[in-house]
């Protein structure tokens, strides 16, 4: 549930051409020592920024021919190595400037204005226009965005709401553990080897559904009712149909009646229908029982009772939060388990930290979350090496100068998250998975931007962080995570960065006393 929560973080602009002939080599791509522009104090023109930007359509064709769309992240690393810490690109009609050094976003974010604007997902806005539905806060801009965001911040991202979320998310985490124990028992081998991607998808959807809608979908059960299964299918179909429409205008697909557009509409209809059912259930519960016994009813019910946003505004924003908080969170957890399986000694360090926190707090989960810095560092390290989004973007509202280059107002500027995570000038030994690097006291400013920054940072950040931390606590307390083979898994771009092949993990129960 990170920067989209997903799409909040997903880069939808297309990096410049120059894709290496091989899809990738066996080693992890690392940014080499970046080139620097002329050190003179003379500010250079926008047209002097290096890069491939003079023929956008030719670049688009070359990019498509070289399968660059699935390798956007590696292309960006290649381009930073070729052009230096700043370069300009034009792919089709997308014209942008790309930056990599952590001191650069400080300048960028100062120029984002009162109403920060980033690229929107045209497929999502096209559906809402087609169905005459309101935009949620993820897709809004201007004063309408700001007024909605201020209200939602208090209910979703304020530190004060953490106590509301923890009991709900902790319950889902415990149910996931129980589900894994059942899988191990049924295997008859005292272990369970599987690709966890679908299980983690269900876990993430159950978690975010519990917090947002205040009800369980039942995805941790062996039998999933048809209504919940349809909801899962709609979420999956929505993501599957979004990615191709990044490159083909949805309006054109709608005019020709393309199946991908019809499927996209069907998927969103199902997602919004789920929100409608939840709203009806909430009103029914409020009429029947005014005493909630102190239990947090969920974000949707809280916003309805607050009565500061219209029902349609609430439904739109909550639906976007839910849609953006599934794949992003589940993929980050999958990469984290993958890295812990590759580093068993580190896994034991995290397990020991969790054990100390459990003993010190007598199991008070809210207090435990304050005592697991290495676990939190592991999640930051995962987002450094395996970010869900390729880049973080802003349209600047004033002229700025970066690396002695003038960048005019209105330009789309992108910070390469994937590339920065592999820059040895920013992260020593970038190829190493080292959660301890986040425990240091030196300046880490603008180095961990997986959830974005400033007023337009990921709205679901508090939910996502809590959900992932609780998941790791429960998994570390109950299972040892192993990998079958020492095979390195790379990323591929499909709206977000995903493992390019299944990650097989083996879960073994910890024996009593371990």
Swiss-Prot record:
<protein>
    <recommendedName>
        <fullName>Cholesterol side-chain cleavage enzyme, mitochondrial</fullName>
        <ecNumber>1.14.15.6</ecNumber>
    </recommendedName>
</protein>
<dbReference type="InterPro" id="IPR017972">
    <property type="entry name" value="Cyt_P450_CS"/>
</dbReference>
<dbReference type="InterPro" id="IPR050479">
    <property type="entry name" value="CYP11_CYP27_families"/>
</dbReference>
<keyword id="KW-0755">Steroidogenesis</keyword>
<keyword id="KW-0999">Mitochondrion inner membrane</keyword>
<dbReference type="GO" id="GO:0008386">
    <property type="term" value="F:cholesterol monooxygenase (side-chain-cleaving) activity"/>
</dbReference>
<comment type="pathway">
    <text>Lipid metabolism; C21-steroid hormone metabolism.</text>
</comment>
<dbReference type="InterPro" id="IPR002401">
    <property type="entry name" value="Cyt_P450_E_grp-I"/>
</dbReference>
<dbReference type="GO" id="GO:0020037">
    <property type="term" value="F:heme binding"/>
</dbReference>
<dbReference type="GO" id="GO:0005743">
    <property type="term" value="C:mitochondrial inner membrane"/>
</dbReference>
<dbReference type="GO" id="GO:0071375">
    <property type="term" value="P:cellular response to peptide hormone stimulus"/>
</dbReference>
<comment type="similarity">
    <text>Belongs to the cytochrome P450 family.</text>
</comment>
<keyword id="KW-0153">Cholesterol metabolism</keyword>
<keyword id="KW-1207">Sterol metabolism</keyword>
<keyword id="KW-0479">Metal-binding</keyword>
<feature type="transit peptide" description="Mitochondrion">
    <location>
        <begin position="1"/>
        <end position="39"/>
    </location>
</feature>
<keyword id="KW-0560">Oxidoreductase</keyword>
<dbReference type="GO" id="GO:0008203">
    <property type="term" value="P:cholesterol metabolic process"/>
</dbReference>
<keyword id="KW-0443">Lipid metabolism</keyword>
<dbReference type="InterPro" id="IPR001128">
    <property type="entry name" value="Cyt_P450"/>
</dbReference>
<dbReference type="GO" id="GO:0006704">
    <property type="term" value="P:glucocorticoid biosynthetic process"/>
</dbReference>
<keyword id="KW-0809">Transit peptide</keyword>
<keyword id="KW-0496">Mitochondrion</keyword>
<keyword id="KW-0753">Steroid metabolism</keyword>
<dbReference type="GO" id="GO:0006700">
    <property type="term" value="P:C21-steroid hormone biosynthetic process"/>
</dbReference>
<feature type="binding site" description="axial binding residue">
    <location>
        <position position="458"/>
    </location>
    <ligand>
        <name>heme</name>
    </ligand>
</feature>
<keyword id="KW-0349">Heme</keyword>
<dbReference type="InterPro" id="IPR036396">
    <property type="entry name" value="Cyt_P450_sf"/>
</dbReference>
<keyword id="KW-0472">Membrane</keyword>
<comment type="function">
    <text>Catalyzes the side-chain cleavage reaction of cholesterol to pregnenolone, the precursor of most steroid hormones.</text>
</comment>
<keyword id="KW-0503">Monooxygenase</keyword>
<dbReference type="GO" id="GO:0034650">
    <property type="term" value="P:cortisol metabolic process"/>
</dbReference>
<dbReference type="Pfam" id="PF00067">
    <property type="entry name" value="p450"/>
</dbReference>
<dbReference type="GO" id="GO:0005506">
    <property type="term" value="F:iron ion binding"/>
</dbReference>
<keyword id="KW-0408">Iron</keyword>
């Amino acid at each position: 549930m990170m920067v989209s929560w997903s799409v909040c973080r997903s880069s939808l602009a297309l990096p410049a051409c120059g894709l290496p002939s091989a899809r990738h080599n066996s080693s992890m791509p690392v940014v080499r020592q970046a080139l620097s522009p002329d050190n003179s104090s003379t500010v250079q023109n926008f047209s002097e920024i290096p890069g491939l930007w003079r023929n956008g359509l030719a670049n688009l064709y070359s990019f498509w021919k070289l399968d660059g769309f699935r390798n956007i992240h590696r292309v960006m690393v290649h381009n930073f190595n070729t052009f230096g810490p700043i370069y300009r690109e034009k792919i089709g009609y997308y014209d942008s400037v790309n930056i990599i050094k952590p001191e650069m976003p400080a300048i960028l974010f100062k120029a984002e204005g009162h109403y920060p604007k980033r690229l929107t997902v045209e497929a999502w806005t096209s559906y809402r226009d087609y169905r005459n539905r309101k935009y949620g806060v993820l897709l809004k801009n201007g004063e309408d965005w700001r007024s909605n965001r201020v209200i939602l911040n208090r209910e979703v991202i304020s530190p004060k709401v953490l106590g509301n979320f923890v009991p709900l998310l902790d319950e889902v985490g415990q149910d996931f553990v129980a589900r894994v124990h059942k899988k191990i028992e049924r295997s008859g081998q005292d272990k369970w080897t599987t690709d966890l991607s679908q299980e983690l998808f269900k876990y993430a959807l159950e978690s975010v559904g519990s917090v947002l809608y205040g009800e369980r979908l039942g995805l941790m059960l062996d039998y999933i009712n048809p209504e919940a299964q349809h909801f899962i299918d709609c979420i999956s179909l929505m993501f599957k149909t979004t990615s191709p429409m990044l490159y083909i205008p949805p309006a054109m697909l709608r005019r020709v009646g393309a199946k991908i557009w019809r499927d996209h509409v069907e998927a969103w209809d199902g997602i919004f229908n789920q929100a409608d059912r939840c709203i009806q259930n909430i009103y029914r519960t409020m009429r029947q029982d005014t005493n909630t016994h102190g239990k947090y009813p969920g974000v949707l019910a809280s916003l309805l009772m607050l009565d500061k946003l219209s029902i349609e505004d609430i439904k739109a924003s909550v639906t976007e939060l839910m849609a953006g908080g599934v794949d992003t969170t589940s993929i980050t957890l999958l990469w984290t388990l993958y890295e812990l399986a590759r580093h068993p000694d580190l896994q034991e360090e995290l397990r020991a930290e969790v054990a100390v926190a459990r003993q010190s707090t007598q199991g008070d989960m809210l207090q435990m979350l304050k005592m697991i810095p290495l676990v939190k560092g592991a999640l930051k390290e995962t987002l450094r090496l395996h970010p869900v989004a390729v880049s973080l973007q802003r349209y600047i509202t004033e002229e700025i100068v970066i690396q002695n280059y003038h960048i005019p107002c209105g330009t789309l500027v992108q910070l390469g998250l994937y590339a920065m995570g592999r820059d040895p000038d920013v992260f020593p030994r970038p190829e190493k998975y080292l959660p301890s690097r986040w425990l240091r006291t030196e300046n880490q400013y603008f180095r961990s931007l997986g959830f974005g920054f400033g007023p337009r940072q990921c709205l679901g950040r508090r939910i996502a962080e809590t959900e992932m931390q609780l998941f790791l606590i429960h998994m570390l307390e109950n299972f040892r995570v192993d990998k079958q083979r020492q095979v390195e898994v790379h990323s591929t771009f499909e709206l977000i960065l995903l493992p390019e092949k299944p990650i097989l993990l083996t879960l073994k129960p910890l024996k009593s006393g371990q």
